[in-house]
Amino acid sequence: TKPLITATTPHEIDTQARSAMAEHQPLYTLDEQLLGDLAPDIIVTQDLCHVCSIDLAAVQRIAATLPTKPRVIALNPQTFEAVLDDLLTLGQAIGREHQALATITNLRNRVYSAQEFVNPFAAGESVAMLEWTDPIFIGGHWTPQLIERAGALHPLNPTQPVKGAGAAQGPIGMTQRQAGKSIAIPPEVLVASQPDAILIAPCGRSLAQARNDVLELSKSPWWPTLKAVRTGRVALADGNHFFNRPGPRLVDALEFLVGWLHNRPALIPPGLLWEKWP
């Protein structure tokens, strides 16, 4: 696939994407010739975010024209648990169910190990996770889950217990909580919330791009009024590397959050693309 968005700044990208979607224009193109040459048996795509990847209907249409008539598997995980379930779905699809189960077990063990450093019943710091900077979008889906399981709060888009889950507290109960989609907020709402810590991991942006995005954001008159800015509790991350994509690296994200929020740097996996700001 190849993006059709040509803008480079967050505001311009958002404007161009909104305009294209309003006119029912695609945001991505698929190399049909290359796909045909590859002759896949299975095509894995996603139906979670129409801005992040090619439209599912387009993939299905093209797949139907291929001689191999590949099976299209569309993933749509809304929660961290659903991300792990999708690993099993893919493992079963390619005849590697045993390996998928082993991978899931390993990932869950890492989650439990990280959470041993967290008191799930104590009120932690409030965190604002920005997955876009202009306009400001607050992270949703699995991101609030990870933040809360790392012992913090995500008040601008918190999780809620699923129906019938009661309070859904504690290490096990928290698996019965989920959040909605990412939400756009005006800067005034961010300022009013005065988060203790701010994590900025723009969707689809590299760490260098995130650095430039935050540099522009920091020129806003309200930026220095934020408590997290004044106390040096702002971190940048390559969102694609370990936050925005629904895959195994979400466990890296949880380990990072526990290490960063609780001042335990040894818990942060080596090689993660993140840095403190400024």
List the predicted regions and their residue ranges.
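N-terminal ligand-binding lobe of clamshell/alpha-beta domains
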Residues: T1-P278
